[in-house]
């Protein structure tokens, strides 16, 4: 279950399905990925589908995980006690 968001606007998107910071072509896919995160009880629940490209992050993001949304867009988060914390949407360049 998603417990906390690192970005207040992403939490607004979670509740409304719209936000000016989310490109319209990304909205439906982002909702599906966030639903998947909300249902997950362990990071292993996110290994399928393979398009998630679940991976542990390193360096300054040590302890975080990421899944692919589309193109260079990723959802980054911490997973603890079966819950998602500090969820954020980032675009890698």
Describe the predicted segments one by one.
Residues 42-65:
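A short, surface-exposed loop/turn module that caps and links secondary-structure elements
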Residues 34-37, 41-42:
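Basic, amphipathic alpha-helical segments enriched in Lys/Arg and hydrophobic/aromatic residues
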Residues 58, 65-93:
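Enriched for short, Lys/Arg-rich terminal
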């Amino acid at each position: 279950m998603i417990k906390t968001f690192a970005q207040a606007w992403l939490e607004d998107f979670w509740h409304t399905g719209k936000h000016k910071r989310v490109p319209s072509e990304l909205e439906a896919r982002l909702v599906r990925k966030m639903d998947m995160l909300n249902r997950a009880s362990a990071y292993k629940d996110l290994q399928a589908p393979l398009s998630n490209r679940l991976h542990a992050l390193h360096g300054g993001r040590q302890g975080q995980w990421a899944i692919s949304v589309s193109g260079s867009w990723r959802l980054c988060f911490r997973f603890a006690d079966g819950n998602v914390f500090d969820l954020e949407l980032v675009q890698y360049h």
